[in-house]
Amino acid sequence: MIRKSIVLLSIALGIITLWSCGSEAGTEQQSVEDNQEAVVEEVQVETEDTEEADFIIPSALQIHTIFKSSGLKYIDGITNAPDNTSKYLSKFEKLLNFGVYSADMFYCVLNDQTQLSTQYLKSIRTLSDETGMSGIFNSAPILERFEANIGNKDSVISIMLEFQEKTDVLIAENNEEHTAMVIFTGAWLEGMYIGLDAARNSDNEMLRERLIEQMTILPNLIKGLDIQPNKNDQTKDLQAKIVALSDYFGSIEGLKGEDEYSYDVSVLETSHFQEFYKQVSAMRNEITKSKV
């Protein structure tokens, strides 16, 4: 049996003064570059595959930080409703939406929607209790500290970084790295859903470039779902849809550059982003059980 490596990537922000009302996208991007430190933890997953592979999975906070610095604005009502937790019955659904709600929480925090972000943290706590991850909240009063610091953005983001770290540590300590892949898949789909909703009707080239960079994670999502133990129809169906999205992305003529991570975004038309959105939103709405 071969071990596959998953790299859990969390972002530690130094001086969190990135999102003041008067900031320009370019200034915010420089602030991110100056003040972030990547903390990488490598963990192991047992798998039956005959080859080793590394999975790089950025945090939901990192994804939204990248999109925010690229000019993504807050869209009221686009996130998953916090009271939808009762809709999710299987552990797979709960873990996916743990990721969805994590993405929504960070999106709200970075856009000064602190009251709504508190509701998302409560939804995450509900799902963590139902999936055996209550230790994230039991080890420290994260929710209580979050509510007490609701008016201090720097403190709130620091608490969110602590939440991300505790999630990663708990998963690693319990050898549940395959769980991390399901959570990240939900977070990735939600982040891309929000970003593509803006990009499909916008000429924001920086945002579009960042979205294409995130599309390169698709092979890791596919592999991450492939290593799931006791895969059921839900897992296989979602994996098949992500494969279809990856195939469409790879079929766009002239997009792939000379090396693995080189892409010519100039060949993309608005119709391509509309198709990306169509496929991502279909998956997102299915896993969140949202009405179209």
Region roles according to the model:
Residues N152-T235:
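Extended amphipathic alpha-helical interaction segments
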Residues M1-L9:
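Bacterial N-terminal signal peptides that target proteins for export
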Residues G22-A25:
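Bacterial signal peptide processing site
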Residues S31-E144:
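N-terminal Sec/ER secretory leader and immediately downstream segment
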Residues D226-V292:
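A cross-kingdom marker for long, charged
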Residues S86, S90-E93, M105-D112, L116, ...:
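Non-transmembrane, amphipathic alpha-helical segments
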Residues T17-S20:
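C-terminal motif of bacterial Sec signal peptides marking the signal peptidase cleavage site
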Residues M105-D112, T131, I171-N174, G195-D203, ...:
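Secondary-structure edge/capping motif, primarily at the C-terminal ends of alpha-helices
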